[in-house]
C-alpha cells in the first residue's frame, strides 16, 4: 500500500511508529489484522491506496483506462494508458494523464500564445471521480474507461445508475460503494454527496457548451462531454436537453427558467429573444419542461422541469386548503 499518499492527502505528518500507522489504517477499515498478528489489505485499502490493482485477484481489471483517438471516431487510436495505482493515491496521475491527452485550443492574449483544454477541468474531474466511485465492482472483466476524441470525451463505468438518469442533478444521491465514496470525499477527490452534478452543469452552462449526454448502455453508465461549438450547429434534441438540464439546475437553486435565463445559457443577444422563445417552445413540445404559471406573455413566462409540476400543484392545493 502507498501509505505515504494517505498522509499527503490528509495533510498529516507520517508517524515514525509503524504500529501507529497500522492502527490508524485499521480504524479506517483499510487493513485487518489476522489471528497470527499479520495484516491483510482489505478491498477498500487496495482500491484507495494500492500500488498496483493488478496485484489483487478481485480488482485486477479495475485500473482506470484512458484512450486517445485521432478525430471523432474509434478508427485511429493514437495513445492508451492504464493507470494501475489505487484511486486515491493515483487520482492526480489519472487527471494529469487526461489533461495531457486532451486536445487543446490555442488562443492569443496580448501577443502571448496560450493553450486551453478543450474540455473544462471541473466537469472532467467530477465525472472521472463519479465513474471510479459508482462503478459496479461485481461486474467482472471491465473497469472505468475514459475515451478522448477531438470533439468529445466519454467517461464510462460498469454498472447502471441507482437513480433515474434523468434526475442526476436533483435526486438525493445513492452510492453502491458508500465506504469508498466517503473516503474519497474526505480526501477532497470528489464533491460532497449531491452537489457534483450541480457543479458539472453549472460549469458547462458558464462556458455555454452543449449539455453532457447521459446514457445507460448494457448495465454501464456513459457520460459524454462535448467541446465548444456554435449554437447554430446544435441539433434541436441537443438544445432541448440543454434546456432540461438548465431547468433542473434552476430548480435546485430555487428559481425558474425564463427567456432571459435561456438567452444567458446559449449566449443569445436580447434583441434575439424570439429565438429563445422558439427553443422554449421546442422544449415544451418535447415534454421536458412545463409552465410554472399561466400569466404573462411568452417573454415573461416561467418554466419548471416536467417532474416539478406535481409538487407545485400539491403546494398550491395545500395553500388553498389552509
What name fits each language-model region?
Residues 31, 284-295:
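A short, conserved structural fragment
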Residues 294-319:
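Short, cationic-aromatic polyanion-contact patches
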Amino acid at each position: 500500500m502507498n501509505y505515504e499518499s494517505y498522509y499527503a492527502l490528509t495533510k498529516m505528518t507520517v508517524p515514525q511508529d509503524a504500529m501507529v500507522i497500522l492502527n490508524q489504517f485499521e480504524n479506517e477499515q483499510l487493513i485487518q489484522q489476522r489471528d497470527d498478528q499479520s495484516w491483510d489489505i482489505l478491498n477498500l485499502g487496495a482500491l484507495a491506496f494500492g500500488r498496483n490493482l493488478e496485484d489483487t485477484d478481485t480488482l485486477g481489471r479495475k485500473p482506470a483506462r484512458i484512450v486517445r483517438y485521432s478525430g471523432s471516431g474509434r478508427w485511429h487510436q493514437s495513445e492508451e494508458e492504464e493507470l494501475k495505482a489505487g484511486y486515491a493515491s493515483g487520482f492526480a496521475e489519472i487527471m494529469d494523464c487526461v489533461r495531457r491527452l486532451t486536445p487543446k485550443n490555442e488562443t492569443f492574449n496580448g501577443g502571448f500564445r496560450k493553450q486551453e483544454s478543450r474540455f473544462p477541468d471541473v466537469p472532467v474531474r467530477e465525472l472521472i471521480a463519479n465513474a471510479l466511485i459508482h462503478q459496479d465492482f461485481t461486474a467482472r472483466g471491465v473497469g472505468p474507461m475514459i475515451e478522448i476524441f477531438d470533439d468529445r470525451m466519454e467517461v464510462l463505468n460498469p454498472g447502471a445508475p441507482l437513480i433515474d438518469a434523468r434526475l442526476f442533478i436533483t435526486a438525493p444521491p445513492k452510492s453502491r460503494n458508500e465506504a469508498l465514496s466517503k473516503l474519497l470525499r474526505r480526501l477532497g477527490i470528489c464533491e460532497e454527496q449531491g452537489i457534483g452534478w450541480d457543479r458539472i452543469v453549472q460549469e458547462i452552462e458558464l462556458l455555454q457548451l452543449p449539455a453532457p449526454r447521459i446514457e445507460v448502455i448494457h448495465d454501464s453508465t456513459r457520460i459524454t462531454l462535448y467541446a465548444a461549438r456554435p449554437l447554430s450547429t446544435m441539433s434541436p434534441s441537443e438544445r432541448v436537453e440543454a434546456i432540461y438540464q438548465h431547468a433542473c439546475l434552476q430548480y435546485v437553486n430555487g428559481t425558474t427558467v425564463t427567456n432571459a435565463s435561456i438567452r444567458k445559457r446559449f449566449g443569445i443577444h436580447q434583441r434575439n429573444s424570439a429565438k429563445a422563445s422558439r427553443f422554449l417552445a421546442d422544449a415544451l413540445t418535447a415534454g421536458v419542461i412545463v409552465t410554472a404559471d399561466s400569466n404573462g406573455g411568452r417573454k415573461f413566462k416561467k418554466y419548471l422541469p416536467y417532474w416539478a409540476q406535481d409538487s407545485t400543484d400539491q403546494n398550491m392545493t395545500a395553500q388553498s386548503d389552509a
